[in-house]
Amino acid sequence: MKTKLLFLSLLGSFLAHAQTLQFKNLANMSAGRGAITSVIVNDNIYVSNGYLEKGGNANYIEKYNITDNKWSILNSTLLTKKFANSETYDNKIYIFNGWGNSHLEIVDLATNTITKGAVNRFYTGNAGSAIYNGKIYVFGGSGLSGAKSTVFSDKFQYYDIASNTWNPLPDMPTARETKGKIVNDKLYVIGGFNGTPSRLINVYDLKTNVWVNQYTMPSGISGHSLAVSGDKIFIVGGFNNQTFLAYFDTTTNKLHQLSSNMIPRRHAAAEIYNNKLYIIGGSTTSVTSSAIKSIQVADIN
């Protein structure tokens, strides 16, 4: 594996003249939830699972309609779990991972029914996932195949929706809990945790199936969420720096930090729709009662 090691220099605007995003509050979820996962379909955001402010893990999907600014419970028959993943394809939501969960649940949004997909032998919690050309790419995490959550994974695989099969890929350069997004045929795996917050951004070329680049951020970030707008990957919240907000420009490979009035949070969800960044749920401590109901939105133009 040939990997270029590059350090991300800070732009002048990073320190002195950082762009400011102004968030406004929207209708709250029915309950505070952390360690959630989300997808966006048309003008609806679907938030799955996570731990509840009153204790225990959620077994339902809550739908937020952006146009109406209203929440509704979509389905209450999911397996309970936290730190899971979800992706959407062809009006279905694919929900998988989460500590101790080897199942793949497929929610048909047209019928509100759930079917099971192929068993995921290499399940983890707090992993990253992204979808590309009918394949769901899954990487990193902890608690591989039922191991302790302090055991970090470098496993990389994809689920082929058409064939309902899980398939191996070259291991990640560094084992860690992490998040990632796909832009222009490349997977960007950003930050994470493997005992300390990670400063790494690893890049995987989906055309050549090779890990091609590695960048180093000025500081580590974990417990964050990601959302994509064009060539930019927005990085939201963090375990330690809970008001962290930045974007990584994949055309210049530079990181730009933003200032904002965002509510502090970690292990939240983030989505982008019509040039607006939505931040949902999360928590502020390891105590479940700190889980957040709030959804906020800011214009990113």
Question: Which stretches of residues belong to each language-model region?
Answer:
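Bacterial Sec-dependent N-terminal signal peptides
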Residues: 1-22
